[in-house]
């Protein structure tokens, strides 16, 4: 444990772009925590889904804060995700460490699926449109679309399925993230100069300081948007 958390060797040349993975992990954890509390009061029914969210905002102590942390946090997840992905493409991480790259791509697809299903859950006018678009993407597979939507059109079974998938997928994401970290620590990190040097520094305290600064910066920015 010490070799992976404290004395883990990191390239000397890495910059702040290498902290985006940590920030992405923190925002995903924040999404899971706030999503659990939202799920406790959410009703997956066409007639009461929208009102259950407003009940959570108005009647639950600090419910408005949890709800907007969840919705604003999703924006930060995708901000850090695309910056993290762009950094990997820009510095050739996909060539240096392909196993880490492919495990990250799996994370990306699961995260996109989770976000699409979460977009449907409030079930206003735009949510109905989103559910219709998502299910129509599977129209080439009749048996699959009927299983996903629970019928021949978007209705209560569709919303229940999307809620269950949206609730379960983040925990599957945690499993893929462990796999992603395993490959990262097994094959080490890339660096901006793309050179294989043995001149490395321990993760703690040098890299930890940058990660901790980002950890403090996220809540400050997020609460500013609230």
Residue ranges and their predicted role:
Residues 1-226:
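Membrane-embedded and interfacial regions of multi-pass energy-transducing membrane proteins
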């Amino acid at each position: 444990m010490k070799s992976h958390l404290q004395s883990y060797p990191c390239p000397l040349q890495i910059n702040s772009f290498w902290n985006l993975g940590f920030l992405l992990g923190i925002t995903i954890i924040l999404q899971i925590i706030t999503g659990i509390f939202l799920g406790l009061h959410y009703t997956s029914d066409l007639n009461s889904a929208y009102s259950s969210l407003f009940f959570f905002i108005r009647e639950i102590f600090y419910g408005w804060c949890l709800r907007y942390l969840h919705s604003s946090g999703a924006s930060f997840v995708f901000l850090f995700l695309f910056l993290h992905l762009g950094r990997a493409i820009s510095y050739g991480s996909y060539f240096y460490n392909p196993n880490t790259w492919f495990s990250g791509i799996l994370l990306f697809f699961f995260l996109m699926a989770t976000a699409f299903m979460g977009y449907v859950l409030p079930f206003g006018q735009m949510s109905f449109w989103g559910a219709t678009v998502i299910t129509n993407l599977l129209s080439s597979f009749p048996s699959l679309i009927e299983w996903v939507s629970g019928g021949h059109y978007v209705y209560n079974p569709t919303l229940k399925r999307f809620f269950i998938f949206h609730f379960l997928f983040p925990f599957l994401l945690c499993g893929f993230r462990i796999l992603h970290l395993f490959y990262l620590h097994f094959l080490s990190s890339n660096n901006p100069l793309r050179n294989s040097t043995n001149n490395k520094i321990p993760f703690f305290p040098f890299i930890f300081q940058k990660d901790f600064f980002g950890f403090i910066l996220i809540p400050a920015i997020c609460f500013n948007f609230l």
